[in-house]
């Protein structure tokens, strides 16, 4: 399981900058999908206001609402298939608990395909990944590439032997369905 060192700055009572926290945060393996790991690094449901103490903002859902943001790390391993002994009902309950809002954006007809009402800036840290859109187009990406995911329906596929690790900055956005 991957871990990130998260150093957060803040302000003391006199308004002087301080290190508010310095800790390791670990990802969570998706239930029933042992090759996918998600790590919520930081986020807020509202615009941040300063000065502050550097305490973690309170937020619940995986995706940010308008005015909010998330920073997350995603690791997708090769052969992203369900574990042979997984129970769909148990996995769904655990996903709903650990990653609120994630199931709601998934396309039940196309495994892995999803759309959120966010703009996502996805930077490939290492490995390779294929981005598939609902028009059938597929784009191969590698370490150093950046995807600006503009509330489009998409899926990620890892056809290679090594895991792909991505860092995402996710901002809440307005989305109006085409007529």
Residues covered by each model-derived region:
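Short, small/polar residue-rich loop motifs at catalytic or cofactor-binding pockets
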Residues: 3-5, 116-117
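A short local loop/turn or secondary-structure capping micro-motif enriched for an aromatic residue
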Residues: 26-30, 58, 81-82, 140, ...
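Ligand-binding loop in jelly-roll beta-barrel domains
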Residues: 69, 77-81, 136-138, 142-145, ...
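Double-stranded beta-helix
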Residues: 7, 11-12, 16-21, 27-28, ...
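A short beta-strand-loop-beta hairpin characteristic of the jelly-roll/cupin
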Residues: 108-116, 121-142
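Short, well-structured hydrophobic secondary-structure segments
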Residues: 28-78
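Conserved short histidine dyad/triad with adjacent acidic residue
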Residues: 24, 72-116, 150-153
């Amino acid at each position: 399981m991957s871990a990130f060192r998260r150093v957060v700055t803040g302000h003391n009572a006199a308004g002087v900058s301080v290190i508010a926290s310095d800790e390791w945060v670990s990802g969570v393996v998706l239930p029933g999908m042992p090759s996918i790991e998600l790590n919520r690094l930081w986020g807020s449901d509202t615009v941040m206001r300063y000065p502050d103490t550097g305490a973690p903002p309170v937020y619940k859902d995986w995706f940010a609402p308008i005015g909010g943001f998330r920073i997350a790390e995603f690791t997708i391993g090769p052969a992203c298939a369900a574990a042979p002994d997984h129970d769909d009902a148990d996995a769904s309950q655990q996903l709903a608990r650990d990653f609120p809002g994630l199931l709601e954006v998934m396309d039940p007809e196309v495994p892995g395909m999803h759309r959120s009402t966010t703009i996502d800036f996805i930077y490939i840290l290492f490995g390779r990944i294929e981005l598939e859109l609902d028009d059938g187009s597929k784009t191969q990406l590698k370490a150093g590439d950046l995807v600006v995911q503009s509330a489009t329906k998409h899926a990620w596929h890892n056809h290679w032997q090594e895991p792909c690790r991505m860092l995402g900055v996710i901002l809440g956005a307005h989305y109006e369905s085409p007529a």
